[in-house]
Amino acid sequence: MEIALVPLENGGAMTVRGGDEARAGCGQATGGELQCPPTAGLSDGPKEPAPKGRGAQRDADSGVRPLPPLPDPGVRPLPPLPEELPRPRRPPPEDEEEEGDPGLGTVEDQALGTASLHHQRVHINISGLRFETQLGTLAQFPNTLLGDPAKRLRYFDPLRNEYFFDRNRPSFDGILYYYQSGGRLRRPVNVSLDVFADEIRFYQLGDEAMERFREDEGFIKEEEKPLPRNEFQRQVWLIFEYPESSGSARAIAIVSVLVILISIITFCLETLPEFRDERELLRHPPAPHQPPAPAPGANGSGVMAPPSGPTVAPLLPRTLADPFFIVETTCVIWFTFELLVRFFACPSKAGFSRNIMNIIDVVAIFPYFITLGTELAEQQPGGGGGGQNGQQAMSLAILRVIRLVRVFRIFKLSRHSKGLQILGKTLQASMRELGLLIFFLFIGVILFSSAVYFAEADNQGTHFSSIPDAFWWAVVTMTTVGYGDMRPITVGGKIVGSLCAIAGVLTIALPVPVIVSNFNYFYHRETDHEEPAVLKEEQGTQSQGPGLDRGVQRKVSGSRGSFCKAGGTLENADSARRGSCPLEKCNVKAKSNVDLRRSLYALCLDTSRETDL
């Protein structure tokens, strides 16, 4: 049964029971209303409502009963104790984890809070220029300086509620666009290459961003060549393959260049008439049936020539005693030794065999052994040493062609000559333009040789007997050489010749600027590699000896290991800014006429240097 105190309008109170009977404390109900006089001890003033219980009036007709009399006014009644509302059941710990952060409420509230946190604005001050972005934009790359809260915390200014960076202001447009675009890096037009590369490294955008930046700016990634794993083979390979690796490597390179030059000079000198006549006399002495005039003597039989057999034996020592043959043998011995040593020490035998320079080395020494075998075969009895059959003449013709291959030894100098390497790279990069040039010349030769042939056909003294015979004239005219051995005579032929010369000038002039541009690019890139090496030697930061740095020995770049040497330039540049080294030694630009791309290339190559925060 529930009991509740219900205040009345006249100041009384009644108790409502859940049953059918109710007694009024101050009166009884009349006409459905309860009438009670004022309770004793209460003023007619504002009445304070009695505290309510948990019950409610069930029925208007239910009975009431009077409350017990109130205590005296002098005694203060005790207020009724409020009943405790039932507390909600506290969820177990696993339920709390599922519900999320109690400060945010439900899981949905936590998601909304996280989303609002990502959309929170961040103020970045770059040398006084304020930028504003969102935390979610920076959080796309958490490994960068701005994306990692722990890394950027040291730059936070609590007074201004912003991050302050004393860096280049125009460069930050490209840095912020990197975050906004999701990884696209674009250099502002008013920022130099080296400055923007330094900003990329400061904000720690990573090696991948640096590689993309280098590719966008037109830098070609050099192929890294591994070194042999064996320590002895590594040292031998560095000595014979990379002349700048040590002093002994430079000495080997000097000896190799001298041997190549001696071989080329010998190849040219042995074709002089005086040396050629002497060699012919050594190889082919007078025949037995053509002796010199006999001198009178006591014994007439002394003028008889010996039989042909004994005359073959002296030819062998005479041929091997030829000075040119001795010099050639010495050079070939060195070339063979160098080739075998490099093949033994190379890290990859298959890659060594496919290298064009190694193929040239083999071709350079191959004719010697064929010539030596042929000479020895001719000296054998019954080998046709007299040279009186057609087979020997054919073999001599083949030997001349084979010995012509010796001229390719001059390309061995490209291993030690940067100029030849630049020329080779330029031709390799300009193959398309060279193909177009040859194609244009081919079309012009066909057109103008046909035109000049028909223009000169009616003239009896013409120099053009056929269209193929006019090819030579068209090539000489289009290349503006003009030997004059073949020339048009008639007016029509001269007009054709004039048009041919003009067309040749225009045809050659079109692709030449592209080839020159490629040459300039490779030339400046090679000089960029030389500058850090010179500066490194002046500073003396690293000794040039067999004990090379382990990091350099693991991977060597394709062009003199400049990738490994670029770090020295950056260290010297940092020292120059800090004032720890003389300015005349640290400032590369002040010592040589080097453009802006030199310092950038060194910065881009050294992607492993950590940025000081």
From Swiss-Prot:
InterPro entries: BTB/POZ_dom, Ion_trans_dom, K_chnl_volt-dep_Kv, K_chnl_volt-dep_Kv1, K_chnl_volt-dep_Kv1.5, SKP1/BTB/POZ_sf, T1-type_BTB, VG_K_chnl
Entry protein name: Potassium voltage-gated channel subfamily A member 5
Protein family per UniProt: Belongs to the potassium channel family. A (Shaker) (TC 1.A.1.2) subfamily. Kv1.5/KCNA5 sub-subfamily.
Oligomer status and interactors: Homotetramer and heterotetramer of potassium channel proteins. Interacts with DLG1, which enhances channel currents. Forms a ternary complex with DLG1 and CAV3. Interacts with KCNAB1. Interacts with UBE2I. Interacts with XIRP2; the interaction is required for normal action potential configuration in the heart.
Stretches assigned to the Cytoplasmic side: 1-247, 346-356, 417-431, 524-613
GO CC annotation, single: membrane raft
Lipidation (S-palmitoyl cysteine): 346
Region (Tetramerization domain): 1-211
